[in-house]
């Protein structure tokens, strides 16, 4: 039996579920995903439009299936739907033992609704239900963005008994809206007679992009005081989000009533944890965000960095919200418009996923056209 890497095992022991932010057919076929489960404490997988765009554009792992779908007359949307849901279903099966061993907390695989629907509530709900039926695995999570149109969709999808990964959360205010949508959805699910213990949700809070945006603005200000604040906002923001999570899930009467009926907490998930600035430690968004009942989804490069030299000293979040708030107070005092930062990041987040989806559509369409000749 392969042994787990000690740094990642320490992270797991501290209450952080390690998920891989990547999926490809090669990773599934080669046994690499299973290897990461066995040696690097990986207990979940997240995907997004950019990940699938990369997987389908590299190598030839999908060629035979695309050719077969072309022969059957599948259009580009149906082709992408089939190849991505097949990968996700297979990943669900690989992770099923972890799902069973954790009582349904981990062993989860996420698939995102079409990013072009980010501002359309009803179509998001419809597609979430379709994806849930197509993949047909209890350890699936449907990713829905935390846009204003996404919030009612999240509640409606949870009310159907479907597990949800809420993505593209950048601000604590929006995170509060997401937790409210979770409670609303679970209350409706209870009224509809669903087993609440079977419905799972995580709230994916993006970290590194916050630093990238705020650091750029601090550099434009250029004062010594501004430059001294670089690299602090992302972690501070996530720590404030965890404090908000604790308020709701450790004391709120609405949640306590649901808990008595079997509902679990909506765990914070740290996403966008690959460090983009080479001046910062490449494990910054892992070792500084350790707390019970959290998930950290990492690109493989970050996973390897933590395995190699990540220093995990236990809980690094609880009790830090005062210091985190001070960072935000200083940012605002120096002229950083935080609400504008979060609006920009949400718009860019949706646009990036839409652009990746368009690239995926265009590349797959070109492949289908070539096969039709």
Swiss-Prot record:
InterPro entries (UniProt xref): Aldolase_TIM, TAL/FSA, Transaldolase_2, Transaldolase_AS
Domain of life where this protein originates: Bacteria
GO cellular component: cytoplasm
Residues of the active site: 143 (schiff-base intermediate with substrate)
Gene Ontology BP, a term: carbohydrate metabolic process
The keyword Zinc belongs to this UniProt entry's keyword annotation: no
EC number(s) stated in the UniProt entry for this protein: 2.2.1.2
Naturally occurring in which organism (per UniProt): Mycobacterium marinum (strain ATCC BAA-535 / M)
Stated family: Belongs to the transaldolase family. Type 2 subfamily.
Record's subcellular location: Cytoplasm
Higher taxonomy: Bacteria, Bacillati, Actinomycetota, Actinomycetes, Mycobacteriales
Pathway field: Carbohydrate degradation; pentose phosphate pathway; D-glyceraldehyde 3-phosphate and beta-D-fructose 6-phosphate from D-ribose 5-phosphate and D-xylulose 5-phosphate (non-oxidative stage): step 2/3
Name of protein: Transaldolase
MF terms in GO: transaldolase activity
Free-text function comment from the UniProt entry: Transaldolase is important for the balance of metabolites in the pentose-phosphate pathway.
This protein's record includes keyword Hydrolase: no
Catalytic reaction list: D-sedoheptulose 7-phosphate + D-glyceraldehyde 3-phosphate = D-erythrose 4-phosphate + beta-D-fructose 6-phosphate
Main location: cytoplasm
Keywords, in A-Z order: Cytoplasm, Pentose shunt, Schiff base, Transferase
